[in-house]
Amino acid sequence: MSRKTHGETSTSTGGVGTRLLKGIREIVLILLLALVISAVIRAFVGQLFVIPSGSMEQTIEPGDRVAAIKPADFKRGDIVVFKDSGHWLGANPPKRSAAGQFGEFVGVLPNTSSNYLIKRVIGMPGDTVSCCGPKGRMSVNGKPLDENSYLYRTNGVPVEPSQMRFEVRVPRDRIFVMGDHRDASGDSRCHLSDPAPGAYRGASAFIPIDDVVGPAKFTVSPLSRMTHFSTPETFDGIADRSASAPDKADITLHLSLIHISEPTRQEA
C-alpha cells in the first residue's frame, strides 16, 4: 500500500513540475512576442515621446506624452519630432537604467532621450521665411501668418512671433522650425549664426528632413490633455517652392534684441 502511495505522489509531483515549466515557457513566449510587436510598431508605425520643457506651450505642456507617427508625410504648420543632429542641446540629462533603456528601445516606455526635439514646421525647402512684417507677423513666401491659434499666451495675449528679425531661404532637403512658446524656444532662429564644422555658418539652423522621426499627431497622456494635432489653416495656400530650393541657405539677420529663456536641456 505504501509503495503505491509513494508512486502516485511521485507521478503527481512530476505532473505539477511539467505543467509549471510549460506555463513558464508560454509566458516567456508571450512576452517575447509582445516585445517584438512593440519593437516593430516603434520602428515602422510610431513612437512615444515625453516632453520635459515648455518650448511648445500651451499646445504641448511639460510632462505630456505625444505620439509621433512614421512613416508619414508632414507639411508646413505640422508639429514634428526630429533627431538633434545639429547639437542644439547641451549636456545630456541622466540616462535611464539599463531596464528603462531597454523599455525605450522596444517601445514599452516613452523615449526620454535628449537626442530628440519637437517643434512646429514653419518653412519647407525653398521657402522664404521672414520676421516680421508691418503688423508684426511671420511670413512664408510673402504670406503673413496668423499664429494666434497656437502661440503661447500670457494673460490671454499671444507672445510676439519673434523678437529676432531675420529673413531666410530654406535649403534643399531641410526645414525651418520654431516652438510655439517663442520666448522659451531655442529653435532655428537661435542657430542662424552658429558655426558649423564642415559647412557654412548657420547651417545647423535647418533640420535635415532625413532626421525627422515623424509628425506628432496626438497627446496620449495625461488623459485630461488627450488631443489630436491638426495643421493650422493659416498655412493653407502657400506656394510650393521646393523645386527652386538652394543647396545653401540664404540668411539675413537684422539687428535686434533677443532673449530666449529655454533651458539647455530642453526636449525629449
Regions found by a protein language model. Name each.
Residues 26-44:
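Hydrophobic membrane-insertion alpha-helices, especially the h-region
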Residues 2-22, 44, 50, 61-257, ...:
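Soluble "head" domains of membrane/secretory-pathway proteins
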